[in-house]
Amino acid sequence: MPIQVLPPQLANQIAAGEVVERPASVVKELVENSLDAGATRIDIDIERGGAKLIRIRDNGCGIKKDELALALARHATSKIASLDDLEAIISLGFRGEALASISSVSRLTLTSRTAEQQEAWQAYAEGRDMDVTVKPAAHPVGTTLEVLDLFYNTPARRKFLRTEKTEFNHIDEIIRRIALARFDVTINLSHNGKIVRQYRAVPEGGQKERRLGAICGTAFLEQALAIEWQHGDLTLRGWVADPNHTTPALAEIQYCYVNGRMMRDRLINHAIRQACEDKLGADQQPAFVLYLEIDPHQVDVNVHPAKHEVRFHQSRLVHDFIYQGVLSVLQQQLETPLPLDDEPQPAPRAIPENRVAAGRNHFAEPAVREPVAPRYSPAPASGSRPAASWPNAQPGYQKQQGEVYRQLLQTPAPMQKPKAPEPQEPALAANSQSFGRVLTIVHSDCALLERDGNISLLSLPVAERWLRQAQLTPGEVPVCAQPLLIPLRLKVSGEEKSALEKAQSALAELGIDFQSDAQHVTIRAVPLPLRQQNLQILIPELIGYLAKQSVFEPGNIAQWIARNLMSEHAQWSMAQAITLLADVERLCPQLVKTPPGGLLQSVDLHPAIKALKDE
């Protein structure tokens, strides 16, 4: 067979294979054209699931008479005229293929009128060469498209259509997605002459939650957490459902839009899933309705003819931006502050220095052994600093020290060896000590410990606070700063800016790097324990704290930060408790020897044992 140019109708039918998959695809393309025309009201009439009739009527700007024939021609569009337009596309349509493709596999009629015209005009294409016929018609300002007998001339495609109910459900889903994208447009959907959906336009500044509830249901609305997140040219808005109350029905609600265009993007879904993974089960999915706005030059929508895929030029930046935005609202809404005691508490009874836990102790390993899967890698400075010097910087510690030592004097002491210089002992002796063996978790945040037959309770949030303070407290080398992929920019007052400048050297030792200008401060790096925190909340609170101080000591700032960090765990597991105590015993050995108030409490089982024996 010789090479030849395909007839227009056949070429359009081939293109229709990508654009027109089913009746819902036709509805999507035509409704998007109405939105591009500036319509504020769109009426959609469907018969027999779209196989018999699809009628889209809008009140948009309409099409001029001399452009009607071009509207049905392939590769004809009013959206773009150059490559620059394509690279900065903001309209929903731009390929100029939809109407030509649809008209090649159906009987399509286009009726339109502009505000400048006295009468409307109707156009339709027919024949092998798709010749367009234009004639006068009666019609208000706007456009109506009628698609009759879809796939009438392509029986192979028609037989793949599903039942009327299934095809209409696909159309209904498309309209739901479009209605969520454009709250300012009234959309009415009818099937076989009956009104099925009525989505009324929401006035500017009005409550969008009413339409959100009508589309996604009251169950989603009750669990929806609003998101408002911005960085540079990136903006993320919308709602994500509370992961702690996600159900299989809610998990079906996953709507994402990029510059108003509905999308199915793996990168976006992965970022959202990653932000929610700590609160979702292995078989659960997050529920969300999110709107991403990005510079059109930074996203390529010309990936697939159906335009449901995009490519981001800086995909990693977009991924982390979405991840941080979703994680921020989840932490702000769901996490609770650590239970910290402001008042110094009496020191618990002294515990003998030489301890051996029953069974194999995960915490009493040699110093060279790495802890089991720590959440944070401690800064080298914390590990290399002499252990005896760190607790002395904590308020209230010295008051307890005297009492603890008096109690220790009453404890039988082992045989004394010749004294060695004090600085050489702590590191070796500390690692031979342990809080004990973790038996179980009590009340979700306390560890029940056993050592030499003695039982005690340890507060995991308080232990976590002391560990973070150790990780943040600088030693011989400043704490390692972790650059932020998206720097945090905040507006500050003159007093706050002055305090930040005075505290800059102290903050640098803690791994917090910032740059200030006239009225703003930009946080560029933070220490590792702060990376998973909601910096939008923590940093302003830290700035407020610094503004009230006259002296800026790194130790005091580290203590304040540790007390104000959100806990990583709403409910603790055995593995998490074991990992935490391993890190605490390695970095804070003094806590094992002289536990501060609120950390450890002995449990006396003798009365219970005696009562059992007396029965």
Swiss-Prot record:
Coiled coil: none annotated. Keywords: DNA damage, DNA repair. GO terms for cellular component: mismatch repair complex. SMART domains: DNA_mis_repair, MutL_C. Pfam families: DNA_mis_repair, HATPase_c_3, MutL_C. This protein is involved in the repair of mismatches in DNA. It is required for dam-dependent methyl-directed DNA mismatch repair. May act as a 'molecular matchmaker', a protein that promotes the formation of a stable complex between two or more DNA-binding proteins in an ATP-dependent manner without itself being part of a final effector complex. NCBIfam families: mutl (TIGR00585), PRK00095.1-1 (NF000948). This is DNA mismatch repair protein MutL. It comes from Escherichia coli O6:H1 (strain CFT073 / ATCC 700928 / UPEC).
